Each structure stands twice: as structure tokens, then as C-alpha cells.
A protein has these predicted regions:
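C-terminal "cap" of GNAT-fold acetyltransferases
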Residues: 7-15, 19-23, 133, 140-147, ...
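Acetyl-CoA-dependent GNAT
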Residues: 11-13, 19-108, 120-122, 126, ...
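Generic detector of contiguous secondary-structure segments
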Residues: 54-69, 131-147
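Residue-level detector of high-confidence beta-strand sites
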Residues: 77, 158-160
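Conserved residues at the C-terminal ends of beta-strands
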Residues: 81, 138, 161
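Conserved glycine-rich acetyl-CoA-binding loop
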Residues: 103, 107-121, 130, 141-148, ...
């Protein structure tokens, strides 16, 4: 059973990081069999292929979809996955069992308001709750805003297969190759080290 909404919103200090002066975003775990998932697919433009992949992973208990709602609609989403998929299985060779933050997306009208940080924190909390001590993500080498965000949140760059980058193929029927960098973060808190 995934964590409660309040548990997902707490940062590493156990504080809830909402800004009550704007609106109150709500982060929730979205089940693929719910009407909420249908809404999320439409409002956050999830492709049929990715939907099928998510449904399969969730049935196998290898993924959790988290979404943020504000103003009565979904404005952001992220997936916590326990796999790295076919082309990126090179990551699993060097970092076996490392869960990943995947498909972080915020509606362009809601960016730079802390929602990405909230979703990443929620995914980290869910991974921690599931017993993981580290988490990773792949970031496109040219995506400077995302790299800065992840660095600010404590992620560090790792080599994969002896290289600073790895290839990720995306899209069907003619996949495009993206160069990604692996970033990881320890999920252990100071209290866990003692």
C-alpha cells in the first residue's frame, strides 16, 4: 500500500513543503484502474504506449505513478519505477536494484512554483517507504534546468558502463536516441546512519 498523501509531501526534515499563499496542490498515488488515471492520461498527455507500459509495471508492483493536482486538474506527474527498461538496462548492471524517478513532467503554466520538487520528494519518500536506500534518474545532457534542480535536491552524477553518458531510445516506430547522464541520491537520513 503506497504512503498517504501527507507522508508523500514531507521533505527529508519531516516538514510539509506546501505554499498556502498560492493554491494547495495535492499529490496522490494514481491507480491505473481508476477514473483518475484516465483523467491524468488526458490532462498530462500520456501516450497509449506509455500507458500500457505503466499498467504492466504497476500490476507487477514495479512502479507507482504520483500526480499533483491544482486548480481542479492534474498539473504534474512522475513515476517511481523499479526497472530501467530494455535499452537502459546498462544502468541495472552497474546499479542493480536501483529504482528510478521517471517521466517527471509539470504543465508549463505551473513550472517554477516548486511542484517538481514536491513530486521528486514524494517519489523519494515512496522509495524510502518501500525500503530503498538509494534512488536514481536519467537526465538529458542538454536539459540544464532539470540538472540544476536535481543537483539542488542532492543528486550527484555517476558513470554507467565506464562512461559519463548512456543512450536512451524513445519513440515508436522510429526511436530517437537521447544522451542521458545518471544521477543518484542516497535516501538515508542522518537518523538512519546512527
Amino acid at each position: 500500500m503506497p504512503a498517504s498523501k501527507q507522508e508523500l509531501l514531507k521533505d527529508t526534515n519531516g516538514e510539509c513543503s506546501l505554499n498556502p499563499n498560492k493554491y494547495t496542490p495535492v499529490i496522490e498515488v494514481v491507480s491505473p484502474d481508476s477514473s483518475s488515471f484516465t483523467r491524468l492520461k488526458k490532462e498530462m498527455y500520456i501516450s497509449d504506449d506509455y500507458e500500457a507500459e505503466l499498467r504492466d509495471l504497476i500490476k507487477q508492483k514495479k512502479a507507482v505513478v504520483l500526480a499533483v493536482e491544482a486548480g481542479g486538474r492534474y498539473v504534474g506527474r512522475v513515476t517511481l519505477r523499479h526497472d530501467w527498461g530494455g535499452e537502459t538496462s546498462i544502468v541495472e548492471k552497474d546499479f542493480p536494484g536501483l529504482p528510478q524517478i521517471n517521466a517527471l513532467e509539470i504543465d508549463e503554466n505551473y513550472r517554477r512554483q516548486g511542484l517538481a520538487t514536491m513530486l521528486v520528494t514524494a517519489a523519494e519518500n515512496e522509495a524510502r517507504r518501500q525500503g530503498f536506500s538509494m534512488i536514481g534518474l536519467g537526465v538529458e545532457i542538454s536539459n540544464e534546468p532539470a540538472k540544476k534542480l536535481y543537483e539542488k535536491l542532492g543528486y550527484s552524477y555517476q558513470q554507467v558502463g565506464g562512461s559519463d553518458t548512456y543512450d536512451f531510445l524513445f519513440g515508436k516506430p522510429n526511436p530517437q536516441v537521447y544522451k542521458l547522464q545518471l544521477m543518484t541520491k542516497s535516501l538515508r537520513t542522518e537518523a538512519n546512519h546512527g
